[in-house]
Amino acid sequence: YSITLSRSPIRNACKVLFFACLVSVGTLIFFPDDFVRFGILHLLGFGMLVSPFFKSPRVNLLIGVALFFLSYLPLNYPAWALPISGGEQYFSMMDYYPLIPWLSYFFLGLASGQRKYFAAYDQPVTNSMLKLLLLPGRYSLIVYLVHQLVILAILILILGSPR
């Protein structure tokens, strides 16, 4: 929903995709057998990148529903189509969110944000306690990256070196 409020969605998408690439390179170095090839940041970055070109809530709703139902078709994707779907049959990965079906949820959220279903939440927050609760959302990319590093560090301490 917040992508509909952004003043610079392409810049934000590029930032997310940059960190997605860093995650891929980092996991390739430390976990070469299970590295992230197309994870949640790749998915969100791609969705953010294409979202400015889809302005109609109705079209976005149709795309979201179509992508969702497309995921139920028994299609065999080749290994090179990993970002689209079916990569789990070829590779072991720590994090995998293919475009089908996960992009459907992005488009459904985009459609609802464009329809202003959440218009009540567009009001400025004046309560200091609420502002504090909204703070993690403002820095969600940093929160996501840091929590991943903390979890991996704890797992390495408990289970030992990944190699």
Predicted regions and their residues:
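Alpha-helical transmembrane segments and their immediate juxtamembrane cytosolic regions
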Residues: Y1-R163
